A protein has these predicted regions:
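Short glycine/proline- and aromatic-enriched beta-strand/turn motifs that initiate or cap beta-hairpins
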Residues: 2-54
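Residues on the lipid-exposed face of transmembrane beta-strands in outer-membrane beta-barrel proteins
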Residues: 20-22, 51-55, 93-99, 115-119, ...
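Residues that define the transmembrane beta-barrel architecture of outer-membrane proteins
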Residues: 14, 43-49, 85-91, 109, ...
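Outer-membrane beta-barrel translocator domains and adjoining extracellular loop/strand segments
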Residues: 30-37, 75-82, 123-131, 161-168
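Gram-negative (and chloroplast) outer-membrane scaffold detector with strong preference
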Residues: 55-130
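Transmembrane beta-strands of outer-membrane beta-barrel proteins
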Residues: 16-20, 63-65, 91, 109-115, ...
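Predominantly the C-terminal beta-signal and adjacent terminal strand-loop region
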Residues: 6-7, 142-212
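Short loop/turn motifs that connect adjacent beta-strands in outer-membrane beta-barrel proteins
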Residues: 4-15, 59-60, 100-110, 143-146, ...
Length: 212
């Protein structure tokens, strides 16, 4: 089967991606039993609170750094308990794989998965700083040129002295805007213009010399 040219390494779909989004944290301690209990379990600020930078490598692989801010409120469940509040900050480094090539030439749909490691600070948790193993699933919807919408769900497994600590597990969801920087083509076109200008200049000089 024929593959897209960028998949074969001739052209990259982008060089960098940046994004800003809203994030919601589900830390109710119920694993995935009630993943969409927004009213009782989801903590989310009203303003965009997550940033992302993605560097494309090759063959659908990229490296992503993300940071997020949130705030726990006393009316939400935290490890099956209410009355807890405090600051939440997460930082993550993930390796991402895009399935964009499977849907080519449908350029607007870009699903991906990613794995990585992170650190999470939670005032509401007994051990304020924990490590986590990230398992992420997301979608980019390219709606206008290099602009798109990104939807992502992350399962974060807490890493503690006991390696995996279920009390430190949580889910994080995000929805926001992304922009991709593609490789510039101006260098080649400028060279062609320079070549044409030099060639015409040589002709002009030659004609002038002949008249003398």
């Amino acid at each position: 089967l024929a593959q897209p040219t960028w998949w074969m390494g001739q052209k990259k779909p982008y060089k960098w991606q940046v994004g800003i989004s809203w994030n919601a944290v589900d830390d109710d301690g119920r694993d995935v039993c009630q993943p969409f209990d927004v009213k009782q379990s989801w903590n989310y600020p009203l303003f965009p609170s997550r940033i992302m930078v993605d560097r494309y490598l090759k063959k659908g692989l990229s490296l992503e750094f993300a940071g997020a801010y949130n705030n726990y409120t006393t009316d939400k469940l935290v490890n099956d308990t209410t009355g807890l509040s405090g600051l939440f900050i997460s930082t993550d480094l993930n390796t991402k794989f895009s399935f964009y090539q499977l849907f080519y030439p449908m350029k607007w749909f870009d699903p991906y998965v990613s794995l990585g490691l992170g650190l999470t600070h939670r005032d509401a948790y007994s051990q304020t700083v924990t490590g986590n193993l990230n398992i992420n699933v997301g979608f980019n919807f390219w709606i206008y040129r290099n602009w798109g919408l990104q939807l992502q769900t992350s399962g974060k497994l807490g890493i503690n002295g006991q390696f995996f600590n279920t009390n430190a597990d949580y889910m994080q969801h995000s929805l926001g805007v992304v922009y991709k920087f593609t490789e510039s083509r101006s260098h080649g076109s400028s060279n062609r213009k320079k070549y044409k200008w030099t060639k015409s200049r040589q002709k002009y000089r030659g004609g002038k010399k002949g008249k003398g």
